[in-house]
Amino acid sequence: MQLTVWTYEGPPHVGAMRIATGMEGLHYVLHAPQGDTYADLLFTMIERRNKRPPVTYTTFAARDLGRDTAELFMTAARDAYARFQPQAMIVGASCTGSLIQDDPGGLAKSLGFPIPVIAIDLPAYQRKENWGAAETFYQLVRALAGPNAPAPGTKRPERAAGVRPSCNLLGPTALGFRHRDDITEITGLLGKLGIDVNVVAPMGSTPADIARLGDADFNVVMYPEIAGQAASWLHRIFHQPFTKTVPIGVSATRDFIQEVTALAGIDPAPMLQASSSRLPWYSHSVDSTYLTNKRVFIFGDATHAIAAARIASEELGFKVVGLGSYSREFGRELREAAKRYDVEPLITDDYLEVEAKVAELHPELVLGTQMERHIAKRLGVPCAVISAPVHVQDFPARYAPQMGFEGANVIFDTWVHPLMMGLEEHLLTMFKDDFEFKDGAMPSHLGTGHAAPVAEAVAAPAAAVATESVATGVAAPDIASATAVAAAAAVWAPEAEKELQKIPFFVRGKARRNTERFANENGVATITVETLYDAKAHFAR
């Protein structure tokens, strides 16, 4: 067990909640203590849904453990059915509720409801949120679509002449990163190709819709973490092929078009010729030359991280210096992707490891989750969010897909805006020594004040501590300690500061830190140009 202040994924029952919340006509009865009801806030506060998730908690408390908690669950299930009248019900236990071992599935089936009741048994202490979502969706598909499966050995009938091909879109859930807009984008893309969408699941579907998944000609797996297992089962039982390409980025979208048209038996050429993304031209234009070889670190779920690495390398000309994911189930795919960019894959759910890797690699842009946004802010590196988990600002009111050609436009804007443009960088270099625009100058609208010299700034904290100590009677060792710390900090000579400014801005901070460390270790009080180059030689060994 590991204590942490952040986790990339919640427990698996949160994944089950994401499936239930995205659907209509499905209710989830969760055997859980009072404290586990926090999960509602994920959907109402972060995703800003206008209604609570369709989840009933048994909310047992410590005083209930001496009584029959099984009866408490059965009462909650009866009340939920009577109140909500769902088309189907899933039942399970939270991570804490599973310790009681009350068998929610058996208890619910004993109640004899006239609707499908699906038990979701999730190993709370071995698996996490995305696995829980995938397992829940898989169990729903098996239970609801299974009765309509053809007999074993039966061949899939050919599509009638004149009937448009159809497919299912599998994988979008509640609390997913831009899932709502991705559905709209891919549905529109398929419509232009002449392909109908039979069912979108789980988001927006009902149990009755899940039951007719087998009517489609093939399946589009939008998010393999969620839909991969269910799509494999549908392929095995209903003989429905499914797509392997996730259409994030221009190149991937073109590959996706070729894949779905091959499955549907139609010509992809007209759509490929009419592709409307601005990303290729924008990234090739002269104004974008400053993007070339920008060092980028990427971390997120496997689907978005792998797609982001391809876009960064092939479409924007970035140099991928780090690639990682918290999706351990997709470790093989991530390692294969990392080989293409000659980087060491980082597969971890410990945000401290991610922060250490970012600090080590010194990227110029970080692409990640909400946590990488915090990490990049602490390290002073530009950042863009590409993957869940995300906070409220990444559920925008506007249309902002990640998939398809419009998604590529959104990605270009999102990734490029945090960066310093090439012209801006050149102007800063040209005017860095100007009396008005140099780093030490005060903003012009604040008057004619001047920044304090470096030596004065270093000495000031010690003087302030000494003054306060005399006034308050703090012991002399504290004063001596503060003075010693101030004295230990090396002072930069003006010519050394000027030389430091010649170092590119994205490694200037590292050069400053290394030089100050070298000076402190060698007892150098004033950093000169010679000290700067001695430090460079020392750390280059």
Curated annotation (Swiss-Prot):
Keyword presence, Metal-binding: yes
UniProt cofactor(s): [4Fe-4S] cluster
Example GO biological process: light-independent bacteriochlorophyll biosynthetic process
Cofactor binding, note field: Binds 1 [4Fe-4S] cluster per heterodimer. The cluster is bound at the heterodimer interface by residues from both subunits.
Keywords: 4Fe-4S, ATP-binding, Bacteriochlorophyll biosynthesis, Chlorophyll biosynthesis, Iron, Iron-sulfur, Metal-binding, Nucleotide-binding, Oxidoreductase, Photosynthesis
Swiss-Prot/TrEMBL catalytic activity: chlorophyllide a + oxidized 2[4Fe-4S]-[ferredoxin] + 2 ADP + 2 phosphate = protochlorophyllide a + reduced 2[4Fe-4S]-[ferredoxin] + 2 ATP + 2 H2O
Pathway(s): Porphyrin-containing compound metabolism; bacteriochlorophyll biosynthesis (light-independent)
Membrane-spanning ranges: none
EC number: 1.3.7.7
Gene3D superfamilies membership: 1.20.89.20, Nitrogenase molybdenum iron protein domain (3.40.50.1980), Proto-chlorophyllide reductase 57 kD subunit B (1.10.8.550)
GO molecular function, one term: 4 iron, 4 sulfur cluster binding
Signal sequence annotation: none
Residues the record lists as binding [4Fe-4S] cluster: 36
Function, as annotated: Component of the dark-operative protochlorophyllide reductase (DPOR) that uses Mg-ATP and reduced ferredoxin to reduce ring D of protochlorophyllide (Pchlide) to form chlorophyllide a (Chlide). This reaction is light-independent. The NB-protein (BchN-BchB) is the catalytic component of the complex.
Family under the similarity heading: Belongs to the ChlB/BchB/BchZ family.
Identification of the protein by name: Light-independent protochlorophyllide reductase subunit B
Organism: Rhodopseudomonas palustris (strain HaA2)
Gene: bchB
